From Swiss-Prot:
Domain annotation EF-hand: ranges: 697-732
Composition skew (Acidic residues), residue ranges: 340-350
Name recorded for this polypeptide: Increased rDNA silencing protein 4
Biological role: Positive regulator of phosphatidylinositol 4,5-bisphosphate turnover and negatively regulates signaling through the cell integrity pathway. Involved in rDNA silencing.
Organism: Debaryomyces hansenii (strain ATCC 36239 / CBS 767 / BCRC 21394 / JCM 1990 / NBRC 0083 / IGC 2968) (Yeast)
Compositionally biased intervals (Basic and acidic residues): 70-83
Length: 765
């Protein structure tokens, strides 16, 4: 019964379905699409008719795109769809019609004629679905809460439908053209005009060529202007050099040879350099290429952007101008007063005075003989100008004043000192420190004592000397040391000795002196109690008589004679590494070793000499100014005389040269090559500046180092000056401060700078 009822219900549903389809086709227009609804299987069978119709329409509308693919694929796709249909209990049940002869089979793969028609209708009316949905929606409110007008909504919906239906490519092209025209209007340009920022299609190739030609012509005009300016500058430089050459040639010295090239040669060189595209030729200075390519040489890295032209370094100078001898003497006197203090000699300044308002000017080069002839200065005045170049060094008295004074020893109390007498073979010996009659007499005594050739000290102020004992312990007395107005004679002292020999006790021999720093100074006299002739009262009377005789103290005079020390042989072959490590120089802590701070070490000197050898004599021949001590005419007079004379005469000339150099000023001038110098043994200031700049020290410190080292005052340095300057740069990098003046020990540590002898140690190979 249940099966019969179900079949009857299904048949009724199919009949109602066909009737409703006909009614809907007649009543609804063609331009409307139906809204799909979901099928609810839980509803009673009477209400499932409408749901079934809506479900079939929705399924057909969603599978419009799949129908074309199904036609090509065939039945294989339909079989796959049947296999992949969900059959789970949780999924919604799809209603299937029973297989009856009256009703067709309803399944996912089989399509009824009605469903096909519905799919066609949905495909034709799918474009108007959005319009229908918008018309059915109620009017919405705008952003301010007011309802929008229905007329505007309808117009907007119609425009949306029209834009959705316009798929013609010609319409798309028109829209693009309209957008381009709107851009021209926004930029205030008509469509026929050309924008300067971008080339439009309307520009012709002739116009493009004309614009390119105009740009090229404008660039050539600017280049021609630059060339004219460079030619003008070159002409100005040539005029300056010609004026210098003419002034030098017009002087009365006909034998002078000029090492500078002529103006015509310079013009040729400059033209060849300007025309050549080779960068190596453009680095040449006055047409002379750089041949030094060593890594340690300065010439390998000479070209820089900041300073391409060769010129003397600009140095701040305070008191470097040529002054009169009287003014030089006053300056020298002021410097001595500044260095008269004891503490200032060996302390470095905490701050180096750098004034911004100092005048920055090139180095003033002293007048040469040619310049003196041009200015009309007589030859008698020229030596005065060279005398001003004399190095001002303190005298011996000032140097003694500069040395540190040792603190005098503390004065001993009078009561704490008591003499002790001992008796040996033929005399007596005193031990302990005795006082002088007065402190002033002690000081005069200390200065007047002089050392004898025979191993003793003598007094220069007194005439008579008295020797008390002939043994190893020497003691000399003069008249001022003896108390009282009467001067005792030698015979009287001999009588006193015989008196003392009878009364004083005999002491045992002293084997060795005690070398303790704090020995017992209050030692009581030792006497022999077995001797019946001696007594304490006799000893006291003897000591009172000899107290008046003042013995020179050991603090004022050194110990006489040479004390033999026992020879200690080395017991092991080990070295004391702790001691060597303690006293060795530590670069990380240079302030802990003060013994090597006042002279240049051998390793440092070799390192600086390597820089000197690779950079000496560079670009000196290219300089315009003359240098001090360089003979541009030929060889010096003394060397020419030595070459022309015989062997005995040359030896005499050399010996006379050594005797003349005893003067301190002459020695200093020879040390700094002020009298005679070779260009190959000088280094230019530009090279020194570039080398010192690599240390990255401040500019003020480098200028101060140059002022301390520069004695030539012509923009060059010789070998010792360059070595000391490099040493000062290293000391600044270590953390030391620059001194007011370079100590003489630093200059003396260089020794014979010209000699470089390597001694090989003889040993096993």
């Amino acid at each position: 019964m249940a099966s019969n009822n179900s079949t009857s219900q299904l048949a009724a549903l199919a009949a109602f379905k066909a009737i409703n389809n006909k009614k809907n086709e007649e009543s609804q227009p063609n331009n409307r699409s139906r809204i799909p609804l979901k099928v609810d299987t839980t509803a009673p069978p009477q209400t499932q008719m409408k749901a079934l119709n809506s479900a079939t329409r929705a399924k057909s509308s969603n599978k419009i795109s799949q129908t074309q693919a199904d036609k090509t694929r065939g039945q294989t796709s339909e079989r796959k769809d049947q296999k992949t249909t969900p059959t789970g209990s949780n999924m919604t049940n799809i209603f299937k019609m029973p297989n009856t002869p009256k009703t067709p089979k309803i399944s996912k793969s089989a399509e009824t004629p009605n469903s096909v028609g519905a799919s066609r209708r949905s495909s034709t009316y799918s474009n108007s679905f959005a319009v229908e949905s918008l018309e059915n929606e109620p009017p919405k409110n705008d952003n301010f809460g007011e309802p929008l007008s229905t007329v505007n909504n309808l117009e907007r919906r119609k425009t949306v439908s029209q834009h959705s239906l316009n798929y013609d490519p010609q319409d798309m092209i028109r829209n693009v053209k309209n957008s381009i025209g709107s851009k021209y209007i926004s930029n205030d340009l008509s469509p026929g005009q050309v924008n300067t920022k971008r080339l439009s299609t309307g520009t012709q190739p002739k116009d493009m060529l004309d614009s390119v030609r105009n740009s090229i012509n404008s660039k050539t005009k600017t280049n021609s202007k630059n060339q004219e300016m460079s030619q003008r500058n070159a002409l100005i430089l040539n005029g300056i050099r010609d004026s210098i050459d003419s002034k030098r040639i017009s002087s009365h010295h006909d034998n002078s040879t000029i090492s500078l090239p002529l103006a015509e040669e310079r013009d040729k060189i400059l033209k060849s350099i300007s025309k050549s595209n080779n960068p190596e030729e453009q680095l040449m200075l006055y047409g002379q290429p750089i041949y030094n390519y060593s890594s340690s040489s300065f010439a390998s890295s000479f070209s820089e952007n900041d300073n391409d032209q060769l010129r003397t370094p600009v140095i701040i100078r305070t008191d470097m101008d040529l002054l009169d001898p009287d003014s030089n003497a006053s300056i020298q006197h002021d410097e001595r007063e500044n260095y008269s203090n004891e503490d200032d000699d060996f302390e470095y300044n905490d701050t180096y005075d750098t004034k911004e308002d100092k005048e920055v000017s090139p180095i003033n080069i002293p007048l040469s003989s040619h310049a003196c002839a041009r200015l009309g200065i007589s030859n008698n005045d020229t030596p005065k100008t060279f005398m001003n170049l004399r190095i001002q060094t303190p005298d011996k008295e000032d140097s003694s004043r500069l040395k540190p004074k040792r603190k005098p020893p503390p004065e001993m109390d009078n009561d704490s000192i008591s003499p002790t007498f001992t008796e040996q073979s033929d005399g007596y010996q005193t031990e302990g420190d005795d006082r002088m009659s007065d402190a002033s007499s002690n000081r005069t005594r200390r200065h007047s004592v002089q050392y004898n050739d025979y191993g003793g000290y003598s007094d220069a102020s007194s005439k008579s000397q008295i020797k008390v004992n002939d043994d190893s312990d020497y003691s000399y007395f003069d008249e001022s040391d003896l108390s009282g107005s009467e001067t005792p004679s030698v015979e009287k002292i001999d009588n006193d000795k015989s008196f003392l020999d009878d009364r004083l006790p005999i002491f045992p021999d002293i084997k060795a002196k005690s070398r303790k720093l704090f020995r017992n100074r209050k030692s009581k006299p030792i006497y022999n109690s077995d001797d019946p002739d001696t007594s304490k009262s006799d000893l006291q009377s003897a000591t009172e008589e000899l107290k008046n005789i003042s013995v020179p103290s050991r603090t004022s005079t050194p110990v006489m004679g040479h004390q033999s020390q026992p020879v200690q042989l080395k017991a092991t072959m080990r070295t004391n590494k702790k001691r060597e490590k303690k006293y060795s120089f530590n670069e990380n802590k240079p302030w802990k070793n003060h013994s090597e701070l006042s002279y240049i070490a051998e390793s440092e000197r070799k390192r600086y000499e390597g820089l000197w050898v690779s950079n000496k004599g560079l670009y000196i021949n290219c300089a315009v100014s003359r240098f001090i001590g360089v003979d541009y005419n030929g060889k010096p007079e003394i060397e020419s005389q030595i070459e022309n004379q015989d062997a005995p005469t040359t030896a005499a000339l050399l010996s006379s040269r050594t005797t003349n150099e005893d003067n301190s000023n002459v020695v200093q001038q020879n040390f700094h090559n002020l009298l005679s110098a070779e260009t190959s043994q000088l280094i230019h200031g530009v090279v020194v500046k570039r080398i010192w700049k690599r240390s990255r020290l401040p500019k003020e410190t480098l200028e101060a180092i140059w002022d301390l080292v520069d004695f030539r005052k012509d923009g060059t340095l010789n070998k010792p000056e360059f070595l000391v300057g490099m040493w000062l740069v290293d000391q600044c990098l270590y953390g030391r401060k620059l001194p007011k003046k370079v100590d003489g020990t630093v200059w003396n540590s260089l020794g014979n700078v010209g000699l470089n002898v390597v001694l090989k140690k003889k040993g096993r190979r």
